[in-house]
Design a protein with these regions (language model features):
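Active-site acidic carboxylates
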Residues: 1-102, 108-109, 127, 131, ...
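Histidine-anchored nucleotide/phosphate-binding helix
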Residues: 23-24, 144-155
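Active-site glycine-rich loop that binds ribose-phosphate moieties when present
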Residues: 111-123
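A short, acidic, amphipathic alpha-helical segment used as a generic capping/interface helix at domain edges
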Residues: 120-128, 144
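Glycine-rich anion-binding loop/nest that anchors nucleotide
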Residues: 130-146, 160-165
Length: 200
């Protein structure tokens, strides 16, 4: 749903798939684990504008937290919730669902927006003795940003592949600000070409 034709299509979202596949190939060639997060909302999710009778992208509150009300998207078991068909999915070792609780949104792959519940991602990474992450995807200014900030808070070293990200950009500079926030918090930003070059 975040790609062309989807309910919450991110501008140029499809352009990230080629970058993702190149990064997957890079990881596989070095024996690095590839994982994905997946929005997995119930049809009555409280972040949906349709549940409140308002226009999509209207600001408001959900369970005491600031909330942008979104078009219905990534409804569990719908076509829109699936990973992109051109993504090299066989290489993905684990997929972590988020946004399953209808009462709170979940931008981060680690926690819901209220940090009341965590996904199994942190435990999985620690079980596999992974302490450094390479993050990319959709959308820069929401899921990528909050996943990266949470990962840094949890003590991971985080690298962000900037050309593998695209933003919603409700405000025109939201993605640029998100990259600045991630960098200021301790993430290292690379294009994929720079990453491949620096890693040898």
């Amino acid at each position: 749903d975040f790609c062309a034709g989807g309910a919450l299509a991110v501008p140029e979202g499809d352009s990230t798939v080629d970058v993702a596949n190149r990064l997957i190939d890079w990881c596989q060639s070095r024996g690095e684990a590839v994982i994905a997060s997946q929005d997995w909302h119930p049809a009555n999710h409280g972040s949906f504008a349709s549940q409140h009778g308002v226009e999509p992208y209207t600001p408001g509150q959900l369970d005491g937290l600031p909330q942008t009300f979104w078009p219905d998207h990534c409804v569990q078991n719908s076509e829109g919730a699936q990973l992109h068909p051109l993504l090299h999915q066989k290489a993905i070792a684990a997929v972590f669902h988020k946004g399953e609780n209808p009462l709170v949104d979940s931008y981060s792959a680690f926690f819901d927006n209220g940090r009341r519940q965590k996904t199994s991602l942190d435990d999985w990474l620690r079980d596999h003795e992974i302490d450094e992450l390479i993050v990319m995807g959709l959308a820069t200014d929401y899921c990528v940003k909050f996943t990266v900030l949470d990962a840094l808070q949890l003590g991971y070293k985080v690298n962000v592949i900037t050309d593998g990200c695209r933003g919603v950009n409700i405000q025109p500079q939201d993605s640029a600000h998100a990259f600045m926030e991630m960098s200021a918090a301790g993430a290292t930003l690379y294009t994929l070409a720079d990453w491949e070059e620096t890693q040898g």
